[in-house]
Amino acid sequence: MDVVEVAGSWWAQEREDIIMKYEKGHRAGLPEDKGPKPFRSYNNNVDHLGIVHETELPPLTAREAKQIRREISRKSKWVDMLGDWEKYKSSRKLIDQAYKGMPMNIRGPMWSVLLNTEEMKLKNPGRYQIMKEKGKKSSEHIQRIDRDVSGTLRKHIFFRDRYGTKQRELLHILLAYEEYNPEVGYCRDLSHIAALFLLYLPEEDAFWALVQLLASERHSLQGFHSPNGGTVQGLQDQQEHVVATSQPKTMGHQDKKDLCGQCSPLGCLIRILIDGISLGLTLRLWDVYLVEGEQALMPITRIAFKVQQKRLTKTSRCGPWARFCNRFVDTWARDEDTVLKHLRASMKKLTRKKGDLPPPAKPEQGSSASRPVPASRGGKTLCKGDRQAPPGPPARFPRPIWSASPPRAPRSSTPCPGGAVREDTYPVGTQGVPSPALAQGGPQGSWRFLQWNSMPRLPTDLDVEGPWFRHYDFRQSCWVRAISQEDQLAPCWQAEHPAERVRSAFAAPSTDSDQGTPFRARDEQQCAPTSGPCLCGLHLESSQFPPGF
């Protein structure tokens, strides 16, 4: 028996052992798998959401009692909407009631109607059972699924017992979905989403709700779990545009500390919506998300940044993921009605400004390429419809040491609407933009310029508040390190500005502590005049640009 057969046999046995533990039910497996021992009575230790507390709960406060009475009074309105769904499914009344709160005994039927699970069950009779059995026999991620199931909603009375009924149903749903949608397979967040559905829906209904949620264009959730999902790119860019517009100082700090590339606030938001805040607020946010669709993601992100503006500007690169999670969790540590009220106001404001949805995705956004690193914004934002540059190493902006006054050229181009900084990238060899390798006959440059007005007419009076630079709006443009094959516009710039005229202004010896880095070595090598003028003759020296760059 060869190594492959031995490994396959071992995996098959491991899979069977895990399945057997769930078939045996609660208290199966090793002692550490048994989980907390059940209480003799849950009467005084379980709140209205099903969360089990270690100590006896205090009596209801007047506010909590009022909220329960209000929820009961709203039940009749939800029953009326369910009874005439075709009339109310796209009405303003449905959205208004979703923000006010969905009664717990209505949430299951309403989620089922919103995700159209009954129709999926009728179209696919018996398919869930087939997918479940196939998953039991061939799942490649059953160990990860088992580990995540053991930590999902363990404080809830449904999932408190290890290998209990709800944990077994959750395992079956995840195994079936892995077999049903191989493109997504299994991701960690799916266990929390499926668990939320299991709180209010039967096992098969919860499975089809998960299928519909990830397949629906309205919710755009599959892009967060699929390696080829194109929705994340558009949502991420739109999020950065919206937050940068409303909170420029916050996003400027995140760019400066390189936190946007380290942990995505939008990705963190999805994680927080699933596991990280109180269950009551989680359910209410999911109610709004299922009704509104992906439009709700931008307002939620905007509120989180707005509430935590001062604390986020103090975030450093030390543990950025943990710090982001803590800040977002603190955002929601307040009254649920207050959060939903601010969310509704933010939704109306963004809808009015057409900032609740990203622009239509471009074809290349559906690829599996990594997410680009955003360029420095300064105090301005990108023009509408623009996209960030391809990913590259994080930029460092050293202070140039000037040895001579660079020549000035007339400014004769038209800026972006609103004075925003535009960044355009072109594929190598694109028509109208010559390839650097073909034009130069030598190594490609290692720097790319953010297009300020028109790249071929870019002036040489580099304006960084120095004694020779009077066009101060140029300080929003900066040098950004990028993949060398993306330096498409260098030949156009060099054609009108010979390198000898510019090198004289940047000829001071380097004192930068990073001159021994691979980037500096590569740039110096490419600056050798072996194949004609080279844009890399622009040496950026010292440590920092003047304040305000």
From Swiss-Prot:
User: What SUPFAM superfamilies has UniProt attached to this entry?
Assistant: Ypt/Rab-GAP domain of gyp1p
Kindly list the GO molecular function terms attached to this UniProt entry. Answer: GTPase activator activity
Domain Rab-GAP TBC residues, every copy: 101-293
Q: Which Gene3D superfamilies match?
A: putative rabgap domain of human tbc1 domain family member 14 like domains, Ypt/Rab-GAP domain of gyp1p, domain 3
Q: Which gene encodes it?
A: TBC1D3E
**InterPro entries (alphabetical):** Rab-GAP-TBC_dom, Rab-GAP_TBC_sf, Rab_GAP_TBC_domain
Q: How does it sit in the membrane?
A: Lipid-anchor
Q: How is it modified after translation?
A: Ubiquitinated by a CUL7-based E3 ligase, which leads to proteasomal degradation.
| Listed PANTHER family | RAB GTPASE-ACTIVATING PROTEIN 1-LIKE (PTHR47219), RAB-GAP TBC DOMAIN-CONTAINING PROTEIN (PTHR47219:SF25)
**Know the name of this protein?**
TBC1 domain family member 3E
Q: Where is the composition biased (Low complexity)?
A: 398-417
Where do the record's region annotations for Disordered lie? 350-419
Instruction: Give the subcellular location.
Output: Cell membrane
Q: In terms of one coarse class, where is the protein primarily found?
A: membrane
Give the organism, scientific name.
Homo sapiens (Human)
In what tissue types does this protein appear? Expressed in pancreas, thymus and testis.
One GO cellular component assignment for this chain's record is: plasma membrane
Q: Sites of S-palmitoyl cysteine lipid linkage?
A: 318, 325
Any idea which UniProt keywords this protein has?
Answer: Cell membrane, GTPase activation, Lipoprotein, Membrane, Palmitate, Ubl conjugation
Superkingdom to which the source organism belongs = Eukaryota
| Function of the protein | Acts as a GTPase activating protein for RAB5. Does not act on RAB4 or RAB11.
Further comment? TBC1D3 is encoded by a collection of very similar paralogs with multiple copies of each paralog, some human genomes encoding well over 50 copies depending on ethnic origin of the donor.
